[in-house]
A protein has these predicted regions:
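Conserved redox-cofactor binding core of oxidoreductases
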Residues: 70-177, 198-199
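N-terminal Rossmann-like FAD-binding beta1-loop-alpha1 element of flavoenzymes
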Residues: 1-14
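Core beta-strand elements of the Rossmann-like FAD/NAD(P) dinucleotide-binding domain
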Residues: 175-186
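Residue-level detector of anion-binding/catalytic polar loops
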Residues: 11-12, 20, 147
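Second-shell loop/turn segments in exported
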Residues: 36-39, 54-68, 123-124
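Hydrophobic/aromatic ligand-binding patch that stacks against planar heteroaromatic rings
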Residues: 4, 21, 187
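Conserved N-terminal glycine-rich FAD pyrophosphate-binding loop of Rossmann-like flavoproteins
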Residues: 17-42
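Flavin (primarily FAD) binding-site architecture
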Residues: 189-204
Length: 204
């Protein structure tokens, strides 16, 4: 998100509670991408995929969110590829063919799950460059004149009388001082890593 905002020249600020950008899953999923087309993969049955993801979630999901990923993840991949391949010369490794399917006998003896052709990764390029994907994004936004406020955690979301989010109160992990950041357009929260947050796990 920060890389996209930086590319568009938006006025934004990004905070990170850790001292450096964190690791991420080595591959990401995207449907019917340019990489999939180049590999000769058949188009995904999107209605069936929506049904499969909803089944896996026991129906406890917002299908609008799932549809957004199904319908827009290809554009996300094109954006990522434009940076990693266009700016850094990396090569996308796309998993397809027999490696991207369930064994045929699975449908005969077990539930016939739908597994979409979706895995994209840049692991070989990460290793060769000595830089992980998120580090490449950090380098990209810094080259465009932006920076990341590390060791800065979210303390509170601020709202106006109507309930609209107007900004945040952040707190420095170094000396504990508070920082008010006003947001004219909005606040984007990246809340991954649930297993590392005991309080959040208890709430769930």
């Amino acid at each position: 998100a920060a890389a996209y905002a930086a590319q568009k020249g938006l006025n934004f600020r990004i905070i990170e509670q850790n001292v450096a950008v964190q690791d991420t899953r080595h591959w990401y999923g995207a449907i019917d991408t340019s990489a999939a087309q180049a590999a000769g993969a058949e188009p995904c049955d999107r209605a069936k995929l929506l049904s499969e993801i909803s089944r896996y979630a026991s129906g406890k999901c917002d299908q609008r969110v799932v549809k957004t990923w199904i319908n827009e993840s290809a554009a996300m991949h094109d954006f990522v590829a434009g940076i990693l391949e266009g700016e850094y010369g990396w090569t996308c490794e796309f998993t397809s063919g027999s490696e991207a399917t369930w064994p045929a006998e699975n449908a005969e003896h077990n539930t016939d799950y739908l597994y979409p052709v979706q895995e994209h990764n840049y692991m070989a390029s990460e290793t060769a460059s000595g830089m992980q994907r998120n580090q490449a994004f950090q380098d990209y936004i810094e080259k465009l004149g932006y920076s990341i406020d590390f060791s800065t955690a979210l303390a509170k979301l601020e709202k106006d009388d109507t309930g609209r989010i107007t900004g945040i109160i952040a707190q420095s992990n170094d000396d504990g001082h508070f920082i008010r950041i006003n947001a004219a357009k909005g606040v984007l929260l990246a809340c991954g890593g649930y297993p590392g947050n005991p309080y959040m796990m208890e709430q769930l």
